[in-house]
Structures are given as C-alpha cells and as structure tokens.
C-alpha cells in the first residue's frame, strides 16, 4: 500500500526485469544501502511470485542477521525497485487485464534492484523461508528462499 493507495507489482511474464538482481543483486538489512549482508545467488519468477536464493556474508553484522533469520526472529522480506510503467485503475474500475479492481496502481514494467531482510514488512504474506517446510534439510547458513513483495511501500527510494 502506497501513501495514496494500493500498489501492485505485476509478476506476469515480461513484467519484471530481473537483470540487475541477476548481475549484481545484493541483500540489505532494512533497505539500508550501507548494511549489505549478502548477495543474490539466484532469482526467478514462478507462479506469479518472485523467488530468490541468497547467501549471507561472513562478517559479524551479517552473521547476526543470519542467526535472527534462522531462529525465526526476522521473517520479513522486501524489495527495492524502480517502475518503468504504471497502470492507474480508478475506484470501482477493472485493470486492463481484468485481474484487479481499483483503486490501485499497478507496476506493469518494473525492475527490482535489491532484496532486504526487514523487521517490519509492508506485505506480511511475503517472507523468509515460506517454502522451507517443504525442504527442511535446506541449509539456511548459506542460502534462504525469499519471495518478493507484490505490494510494497518503497519508503527508502532515493
């Protein structure tokens, strides 16, 4: 939800440009650009959701965050992104593809540039290890499955 209404990040084929995350994706803590805690090792869209595998750095600060993720204290995930194309849907109207009812703003072409482990996510349906129940043997020390936000407040965009 943006300050003026619902924001939807479209995950349809061709909507998300993952190039930046694939080439130089970083993992931050709470969107702080000076709090790099890891790197993105793999990113993809599947089932209209974004997914990523990350690797935490080995420094003390990153290790602290990794431990909080592993213990379940930190569960929130968010993405920083840029939008190239918006569809504005007026109250009570349908989006061009008929999937959404207004009022809302739909990012039809957008590019994530960072993934953050966050204390308080804008969208509580997205987070760390949502698929870990299916893969209990996964090694959280080296990589964690993440889902990107569909709805995201981008308070830290500069």
Feature names for model-found ranges:
Residues 1-140, 157-158:
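Signature of dsDNA virion morphogenesis modules
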Residues 143-158:
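Polycationic, low-complexity disordered segments in secreted or periplasmic proteins
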């Amino acid at each position: 939800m943006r300050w003026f209404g619902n924001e939807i990040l479209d995950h349809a084929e061709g909507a998300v440009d993952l190039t930046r995350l694939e080439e130089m994706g970083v993992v931050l803590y709470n969107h702080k650009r000076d709090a790099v805690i890891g790197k993105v090792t793999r990113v993809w869209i599947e089932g209209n959701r974004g997914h990523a595998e990350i690797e935490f750095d080995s420094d003390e600060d990153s290790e602290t965050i990794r431990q909080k993720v592993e213990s379940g204290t930190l569960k929130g995930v968010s993405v920083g992104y840029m939008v190239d194309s918006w569809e504005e849907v007026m109250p009570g109207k349908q989006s061009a593809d008929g999937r959404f009812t207004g009022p809302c703003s739909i990012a039809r072409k957008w590019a994530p540039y960072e993934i953050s482990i966050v204390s308080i996510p804008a969208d509580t349906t997205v987070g760390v290890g949502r698929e870990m129940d299916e893969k209990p043997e996964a090694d959280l020390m080296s990589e964690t499955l993440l889902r990107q936000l569909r709805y995201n407040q981008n308070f830290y965009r500069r």
